[in-house]
């Protein structure tokens, strides 16, 4: 009966939590849909190629590779066997003098047309206002950003030109890595301490530990981050012989430490609310102390324990500054927990825009 009642409370809490999370996700997606209305190429600019070039469209990743000179031949893009020649507006002075361009670049449209027409392998990134109606080349299609480019993209570089990279996969992967290991560290240790304080420790020990643990929950996250930076990061670098200690493991440990006070406090309070009569009845039936804890106290307290775990882990997963300080802030897809990474909350904090002065 106790187990059924406890499980019923858990299912109710899980249902309410799931609905809340679903509503948050729907709201965030509604706000983020504006991203998919944006074009791949930076607003106000176009990509122009020679008229003889058969290439009509490039993805954001291909554009980045071209301008980073990782792709150097049009053959790799389905075009002719010709070298890719990148042209930006600032390069125009290498082709024409200031007199030929005009004092205010009024002759720049004609000059850009001549450059594109005279170079078979050129790809020009220029403002759209410099493209005339009788432009001798052709413009690459500028499609809207697709879902695949966002959720399956492997690069996050929103300030890249000419095509910003909005690959969300590194951030999702980094968040999952850090969250999973934080839960793995915090959950068993937190529940063990809660059981000790509730069922094993004497009054004097409990009265000392409880305020100390509650005090830890009030420490600012930046202090935890600084502690991780000067203690945990060098320790990980030394133990695992790594080039840098700012890794996902450091972030997981810091987040686990931050989650522990909430998990311990709420779980311990839930266990202490178990009626004394239930404990004594279990012992009277011949159960040992540990059997009573496992079979009676924990099942009765499972709803409170679940709340403590959700609150503690929720705070850890949503943490920004502490994670930003110890994980290396690298927007790459990690293959192990011993590599630098970046989480979604840390990215939000790191890339907030500045208000105009």
Spans of features found by a protein language model:
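Single conserved hydrophobic/aromatic residue that forms the stacking wall/gate
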Residues: 1-7, 11
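Transmembrane alpha-helix signature in integral membrane proteins
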Residues: 16, 166-195
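Membrane-interfacial helix termini and adjacent extracytoplasmic/periplasmic loops
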Residues: 33-36, 148-166, 224-258, 327-328
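Flexible loop/hinge segments at secondary-structure junctions
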Residues: 39-152
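Cytoplasmic-entry segments and transmembrane alpha-helices of multi-pass inner-membrane transporters
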Residues: 189-228, 266
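Transmembrane alpha-helices
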Residues: 266, 275, 289-325
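Interhelical loop and adjacent transmembrane-helix boundary motif
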Residues: 324-357
């Amino acid at each position: 009966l106790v187990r059924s009642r406890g499980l019923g409370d858990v299912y109710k809490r899980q249902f309410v939590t799931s609905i809340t999370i679903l509503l948050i996700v729907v709201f965030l997606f509604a706000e983020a849909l504006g991203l998919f209305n944006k074009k791949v190429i930076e607003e106000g600019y176009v990509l122009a190629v020679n008229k003889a070039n058969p290439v009509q469209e490039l993805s954001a990743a291909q554009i980045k590779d071209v301008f980073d000179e990782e792709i150097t031949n049009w053959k790799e893009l389905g075009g002719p066997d010709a070298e890719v020649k990148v042209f930006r507006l600032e390069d125009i002075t290498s082709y024409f003098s200031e007199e030929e361009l005009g004092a205010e670049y009024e002759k720049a449209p004609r000059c850009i047309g001549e450059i594109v027409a005279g170079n078979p392998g050129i790809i020009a990134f220029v403002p759209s206002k410099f493209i005339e109606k009788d432009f001798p080349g052709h413009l690459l299609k500028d499609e809207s950003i697709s879902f695949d480019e966002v959720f399956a993209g492997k690069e996050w570089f929103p300030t890249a030109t000419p095509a910003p990279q909005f690959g969300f996969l590194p951030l999702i992967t980094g968040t999952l890595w850090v969250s999973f290991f934080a839960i793995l560290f915090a959950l068993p240790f937190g529940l063990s301490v809660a059981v000790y304080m509730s069922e094993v420790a004497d009054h004097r020990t409990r009265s000392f530990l409880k305020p100390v643990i509650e005090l830890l929950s009030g420490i600012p996250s930046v202090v935890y981050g600084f502690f991780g930076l000067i203690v945990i990061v060098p320790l990980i670098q030394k133990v695992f012989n790594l080039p840098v200690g700012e890794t996902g493991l450091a972030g997981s440990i810091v987040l686990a430490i931050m989650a522990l006070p909430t998990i311990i406090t709420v779980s311990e309070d839930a266990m202490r609310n178990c009626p004394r009569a239930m404990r004594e009845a279990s012992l009277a039936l011949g159960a040992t102390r540990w059997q009573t804890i496992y079979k009676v106290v924990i099942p009765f307290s499972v709803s409170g324990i679940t709340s403590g775990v959700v609150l503690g882990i929720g705070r850890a997963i949503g943490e920004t500054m502490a994670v930003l300080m110890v994980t290396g802030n690298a927007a790459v897809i990690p293959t192990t927990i011993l590599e630098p990474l970046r989480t979604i909350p840390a990215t939000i904090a790191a890339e907030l825009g500045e208000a105009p002065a």
